[in-house]
């Protein structure tokens, strides 16, 4: 099942801001958790001025993605929406 994950952070918690390097290991840990859970990344996009990241993931359900956000610690820096989606092609 495909899921659109929308991750938002504030300018203050932006990973590109000096002093916010602590978020980088969280993002790496999330990707590692997803890989280990067999979740396939279809695509990733960023809108830096809006402080929003978009991911399309193929996962059995949204709970796996939610667990990755929690286990990685990324939830402490972002808000997330996990939406099941389907192609309109």
Regions found by a protein language model. Give the residues of each.
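Short hydrophobic/aromatic beta-strand micro-patches
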Residues: 8, 56-58
